[in-house]
Every structure is written in C-alpha cells, then in structure tokens.
Swiss-Prot record:
InterPro entries associated with the record: Rho_GTPase_activation_prot, RhoGAP, RhoGAP_dom
Stored Pfam families: RhoGAP (PF00620)
Statement: the UniProt record of this protein carries the keyword Cytoplasm: no
Annotated site residue numbers, Arginine finger: 90
Lineage: Eukaryota, Fungi, Dikarya, Ascomycota, Taphrinomycotina
Organism field: Schizosaccharomyces pombe (strain 972 / ATCC 24843) (Fission yeast)
Gene Ontology cellular component annotations, sorted alphabetically: cell cortex; cell tip; medial cortex; membrane
GO MF entries: GTPase activator activity
Name of this protein: Rho-GTPase-activating protein 5
Length: 361
C-alpha cells in the first residue's frame, strides 16, 4: 500500500509548516486507508483480497479469481456453521461485537484474515457480511449495467433457457472483479436457499435481503414496481446460478507454492513465471458450532492436504458431494496460471485460500 506524503507547504515568509501539522495530516490519510467498509470494490481488493477456487466433480480444484477478504472470511464461516440457522440473514448480531469485527477487517496489515471467531456468533458474521456489501459505493452490479440485468425479466414469453443465455452474456460483460464477486455471492446464497426448510431463508427472502447491495438504483428505491423487478432478477440469478459458473475443462490449479506478493498486486489473474515448489503440510482449525445459540464451542484440527468434510455443509446444485474449504485466514500463498475459462464441466462450491502479503507496512 502506497501512502502519499506530499510536499511540505511554504508560507509567504518562507517558513515551513509545522512538523506536527504535517504528521497529523499523514496519520489521518493512513487512517482513511484503513476504512475498508465503504470503499469501492476495486480499492477493497487492493487493500485485502483472497483467492477463490472451484472444485469439479472429480475433486480437482481450479483457480477462479479474487474477492475481498472480509467477504471470503465471513462467507467461509457462514457456509460451515450457519446453513441451518433460522433467519440467519435477518436476525441482528451484537452491535458491540459487530463494531469489533468491522474494525478487525478494516485494520492492516492482516485485515482480519487470521481473526479468531471464538466468542462471536454466526449472526455477527452475517451482519458484517451484509454491511460490507451494502456499504460499497457502487453496487456489485454497477449502475451502468442496471437496466441490462433487469431487461430479461421484463420481456414477456421468454423461456428460462433464453433468460439464462441473456444473463450469461451480461455477466460476461461485467468488470472482472464484479463478475467474480457476483458469482461467489450467488453460489453462497444458493447454498442457503437449498437449506430453506431449516433456515427459512428461501431464495425469495434472500433476493429481497441482498437486492439493495447487488442490483439497485437510487431513483427506484421508493417505487415498489421498480425494486420488485430487481428482486425478481436477483431471484432468477440465485435459482440458476449453476448455469453461470465458468469452468475450466482441461487445465487444473497448479500446486500450492510460497509466492511473494506486492501490496499493490492488482485484482487480475497472476501469471506463473517459475516452477512451483510444494509447501509443507500445515493444519487449520475448524469451528465446532452449536446451532441452538449460534456460538462457537470448540476447535478441531485438519491437515491442510486432507479433504475435510463437514456434517452441516450442504451439497451445491453442481453435484451431490459435500464441500470442503480452506479457511481464507490460513496460509499458504499461491501462484496461479492465467486460464481461458469455458463452461464445459460441472463445478462445486467456491473455495477460498488466503493470499497474504509478503511486504507489510
């Protein structure tokens, strides 16, 4: 992260402004950089990002892209612990704990990626997750694409397949960061929708809750007909999200390697320039969750190279296999190849791995 210091001002008498004033301005600027909530998606990815992966039916993991670390960390926690919690995205968490979480995810150099969830509930995580999405100054689907994403739901007599094809083209047109975040969110929301018999979060409910942060227009917020069209569009995207995942038919994720990264690494794919070196096996801690009160009780350890499965992890609509993920707060770093993506293979849920910075301020 680059901090612009600027030039000391010279007054009419040729004297330098006080060092105290200059230092105060510098500290304010660095403090502003730490306010992750309310940043644009592009800026949030520059501050702290996590790599996301897809898993094919044969178990092969493939690199897909990046999402903000706060989304990955909360999303991972929620998918592992909250898919059967009633009203998970409607029930409020503790305002005090939410403030602590928001500060943790907004403070460098770690930005919450190694945050310990013990003592926090899934409702705290769900509130922080929603807050980050809703506070982005530009929605997940940018305003310039707003009408195009509503259009397929306003044309009469279209079949679902025709609408799917229209949305595929529109999703492909999105900027890469927005497309990757949108597909991750749709995947996550579909997981909760598939468990609606227990969590009461139907796809309709989820579309109503997340539509303001994903697909909305400031001029349409007070007109029920307009925002209902947006909710219907998001509902369709959730219900058909498996049709929008771009998959990799031939190439696979390269072996995990210890790769130095720059704080200014962009959100685009990184080209591998050196032969990968396998890293040593490490272990991660997975939370044991009490669904009655939404709290964490104990820890379990798994080998990083083992396939950890979870009894409450739902199967996605890509396959009937259980999901296994690596906590986005866990090492190692990776190098990834640039891939040309296609839709020829079926994929499971998104997976996340942390991409930590080598150089920290």
């Amino acid at each position: 992260m680059t901090v612009v210091v600027g030039v000391l001002q010279i007054d009419d008498m040729g004297k330098k402004s006080s060092f105290a004033s200059w230092w105060k301005q510098l500290r304010v600027k660095k403090s502003d950089d730490n306010k992750l909530f309310g940043l644009s998606l592009t800026r949030a990815l520059e501050v702290s990002k996590v790599a996301i992966f897809l898993t094919r039916r044969d178990g092969e993991k493939v690199f897909y892209g990046y999402i903000p670390a706060v989304v990955a960390k909360c999303g991972f926690f929620l998918k592992q612990n909250a898919t059967q919690v009633k009203g998970i995205f409607r029930v409020n968490g503790s305002s005090k704990r939410i403030q602590i979480l928001q500060k943790a995810f907004s403070t460098g150099p770690d930005y919450g990626r190694s945050f310990d969830w013990e003592g926090y509930t899934v409702h705290d995580a769900a509130n922080v997750f929603r807050r980050f999405i809703n506070l982005m100054p530009e929605h997940v689907i940018p305003l310039e694409y707003y009408e195009r994403f509503r259009e397929p739901m306003t044309i009469p007599n279209l079949t679902d397949n025709e609408r799917v094809e229209m949305y595929r083209r529109r999703i492909d047109e999105l900027p890469i960061p927005n497309r990757q975040l949108l597909l991750y969110l749709l995947d996550l929301l579909s997981v909760f929708a598939m468990n609606s018999s227990k969590n009461l979060m139907t796809a309709d409910n989820l579309a109503a809750i997340f539509q303001p942060g994903i697909l909305s227009h400031p001029d349409h917020e007070v007109y029920s007909k307009d925002y209902q069209i947006s909710q219907t569009a998001l509902l369709f995207l959730i219900n058909h999200q498996g049709s929008f995942i771009k998959t990799i038919p031939l190439s696979s994720l390269p072996p995990l390697v210890a790769a130095p990264t720059s704080p200014n690494t962009s959100s685009t794919l990184i080209t591998q320039s050196a032969a990968p070196t396998p890293i040593a096996s490490t272990s991660i801690r997975i939370n044991s969750f009490n669904p009655r009160n939404g709290s964490i009780k104990r820890w379990r350890s798994f080998s990083r190279h083992s396939s950890a499965t979870y009894s409450n992890s739902p199967s996605s609509n890509f396959s009937n296999m259980k999901s296994s993920e690596v906590d986005p707060g866990s090492p190692p770093r990776i190098k990834s190849r640039s891939y040309s993506l296609s839709r020829s293979s079926s994929m499971k849920l998104f997976h996340t791995l942390d991409r930590r910075r080598e150089n920290r301020m």
